[in-house]
Curated annotation (Swiss-Prot):
Listed name of the protein: Dihydroorotate dehydrogenase B (NAD(+)), catalytic subunit
UniProt cross-references to CDD domains, sorted A to Z: DHOD_1B_like (cd04740)
Superkingdom of this protein's organism: Archaea
Reactions listed under catalytic activity: (S)-dihydroorotate + NAD(+) = orotate + NADH + H(+)
Residue numbers binding FMN: K44, S45, N122, K160, I186, G212, G238, G239, G260, S261
EC number: 1.3.1.14
Listed GO biological process terms: 'de novo' pyrimidine nucleobase biosynthetic process; 'de novo' UMP biosynthetic process
Gene3D superfamilies the record matches: Aldolase class I (3.20.20.70)
Membership in a protein family: Belongs to the dihydroorotate dehydrogenase family. Type 1 subfamily.
Organism of provenance: Methanocella arvoryzae (strain DSM 22066 / NBRC 105507 / MRE50)
Compartments in which it is found: Cytoplasm
HAMAP family: DHO_dh_type1
Record-annotated disulphide pairs: none
Amino acid sequence: MKITCNAGGLTLKNPTILAAGVLGTTGASLKRIASMGAGAVVTKSIGTEPKPGHHNPSMIRLEEGYINAMGLPNPSFGEFRQELEIARESGVPVIASIFGATPEEFTAVANGLPGADAYELNVSCPHAKGYGMQCGTDPELVRSITKAVKAAVKVPVWVKLTPNVTDIRPIGLAAQEGGADAVVAINTLKAMAIDINTGWPILGNRSGGLSGPAVKPVAIKCVYDLYEVLDIPVIGVGGVSNWADAIEFMMAGACAVEIGSAVYEDIGTFASVSMGISNYLDRKNMKLDEIIGLAHRVVKQ
């Protein structure tokens, strides 16, 4: 079964996308992920100035995922521009993940990374003071950031949302009102781990963001809620490890899925997920569009 799809203004050969922050620091690594079957790739989040990130340990493994507190380390858009050009040789859409503290900073980064096939606005990182989630919990700021970037670029703009709110729907609606072509749900959940032998928080930043299979039920619910109120596409992310996870996200309303933590276990995840989706559709004699939002239609019958 053909599984080409349209995701937020981009045509993808399959509905799997590399999530921001995983093997997205160099053009070469992004090309490698594309060669392993990803339908599109998202870069590491890039800002206006070089940022070293938080002290180690910055990532720990749990039974059902990871907690990371990288702190948005990046070389700045000026230094990353060459990596983006290399990544564009991959043959798949390359989405630049960008962050800032104000609409003006977001716009400066977008203008400083010309050539991206789309921009993903990181208004959701939970462990970078002054950035990410501190912007993304304010609907008015999300709206103004989205509007500013949309006015500055001629390619699709996606907004990556935080789950660390009481209700994600007003944030999604604010992104839509600002002109977003899609929302991406979700970024990591605020989390922490403590060494019981010393009493010290394990991460250098003390707290971080939880990703992997542990967050999937939360992500599914967020996608489901957003699909009910938005007119723009929803891209699902959070705990996708296999084709069945991807199908579940699509039934909740996602038009495509981003994959992050699972790549640490198997770089071939994109190909296996795509093949699994195709085989599932063949068995069910269905088209990809028919499973998107299916859970909503079933409950209304």
